[in-house]
Swiss-Prot record:
Segments of this protein annotated with the region Disordered: 346-371
Disulfide bond positions: none
Protein name: DNA repair and recombination protein rti1
CC per GO annotation: nuclear chromosome; nucleus
InterPro entries registered for this protein in UniProt: DNA_recomb/repair_Rad52, Rad52_fam, Rad52_Rad59_Rad22, Rad52_Rad59_Rad22_sf
GO biological process: DNA recombinase assembly; double-strand break repair via homologous recombination; double-strand break repair via single-strand annealing; mitotic recombination
Protein purpose: Active in the repair of DNA damage and in mating-type switching. Probably involved in the repair of DNA double-strands breaks. Has a role in promoting S phase completion.
Record note on quaternary structure: Interacts with rph51 and rph54.
Species of the source: Schizosaccharomyces pombe (strain 972 / ATCC 24843)
Pfam families cross-referenced by the UniProt entry: Rad52_Rad22 (PF04098)
Length: 371
């Protein structure tokens, strides 16, 4: 273990922190930290994944108690094959430093063969070498940082243990709506406003469809219904609740209470549209409701009721349907068909062995007859 020359910026661990780190570093890893992969010669290799090593370092040293730095990156070889592919090998030295100034450093290696792109080969080798060097530097601090994986007796015992399967905890997820930012707080209120606007638009659309379907009604009734339906939708949004007196100002409310009359309603801008629509329908014949009902009854009478599909036995179907002819329905086992060619010197009514010469003679006769 080394120490930095400049000790002025270092912060010492407390005695309790050092005792805790010493105990944790002396422990061996459980089966949930160990991973396996296929190694050379058909065997398996146990190793510690990089993300697990970083989590262990944060847990033991603290998230601000350690740091890592790349000391050197050396390209060992770069070869280009005849097929325009690249073989690259890079070695990396990484140093892991604690906040008290103590550090360990080690070398890692990354290689690739037959890579089509040179940049991808460099990227893969540098990342692989840096990760390997980081894990090798961390294992120098103690057994729980991955050094226990080099103990063969420990590996034999730990591989027999089944790792505990931890359930996924949704409470540990960092969600966007839980972060204390103003922009996220504003986004929460937008769905309510959009819902209110959608509800007003939906009511307005339904009122228009209702008026178009009731074209035969007088224009005065349509205008009156339109105003009565549009006023509550515009002045009484679904989020807030108002009484009938809240819809008018104080002066308008006084005039209503004094004269007991409805306030003057402004002329709807859609009156001219309804008048033009009525003028177009004046010359056309209106279909009455009685004619429509009579036409529906006639069509229902003309529709033939189809019985539901059922599965039944052939005998039951023949017994229930009197139109089926029962004559000649029995299967004739020995009936001969003229359309099927059969050998003349073979009895097809019984099962018996056939000699090979008879088959050859029959085949030759059939070929001559077909020609």
């Amino acid at each position: 273990m080394g120490s930095l020359p400049d000790q002025s910026s270092c912060e010492e661990f407390t005695d309790s922190q050092q005792d805790k780190m010493t105990k944790l570093l002396a422990m061996q890893l459980g089966p949930e930290y160990i991973s396996r992969r296929s190694g050379p010669g058909g065997g398996s290799v146990t190793y510690l994944e990089a993300w697990k090593a970083i989590e262990l370092a944060n847990e033991i040293f603290g998230f601000n108690g350690w740091s890592s730095s790349i000391q050197d990156i050396h390209v060992d070889y770069v070869e280009e094959t005849k097929e325009k592919k690249f073989n690259v090998g890079i070695s990396v030295i990484v140093r892991v430093t604690l906040k008290d100034g103590s550090f360990h450093e080690d070398v890692g290696y990354g290689s690739i063969e037959n890579c089509r792109v040179k940049a991808l080969a460099y990227e893969k080798c540098k990342k692989e070498g840096t990760t390997d060097a980081l894990k090798r530097a961390l294992r120098n601090f103690g057994s729980s940082m991955g050094n226990c994986l080099y103990d063969k007796r420990y590996i034999q015992k730990i591989l027999k243990m089944a790792p505990a399967q931890a359930e996924f905890n949704y409470d540990n997820l960092l969600r966007a709506n839980k972060r204390p930012y103003a922009r996220f707080a504003q986004k929460v209120s937008t769905p309510i406003e959009s819902h209110a606007n959608k509800s007003v638009k939906l009511e307005h659309k339904n009122s228009i469809e209702k008026k178009i379907s009731n074209v035969d009604k007088p224009i005065s009734d349509l205008i009156e219904n339109d105003i009565h339906e549009s006023l509550p939708a515009l002045q009484n949004p679904p989020i807030q609740s108002h009484s009938e007196t809240d819809l008018y100002a104080d002066e308008e409310l006084d005039s209503i209470l004094m004269h007991h009359e409805r306030p003057p309603i402004p002329e709807s801008p859609r009156v001219e549209e309804f008048e033009e629509l009525l003028n177009q329908f004046e010359g056309d014949e209106k279909v009455s409701v009685d004619k429509i009902d009579a036409h529906d009854k006639m069509t229902e009478a003309q529709v033939v009721k189809i019985p539901p599909v059922q599965f039944m036995n052939a005998r039951v179907a023949a017994a229930e349907n009197p139109h089926i002819k029962h004559e000649g329905m029995a299967f004739q086992l020995h009936k001969k068909s003229n359309s099927i060619l059969k050998s003349s010197n073979i009895d097809h009514n019984r099962s018996m062995p056939i000699r090979r010469p008879s088959l050859t003679s029959n085949n030759s006769a059939n070929t001559f007859s077909t020609k």
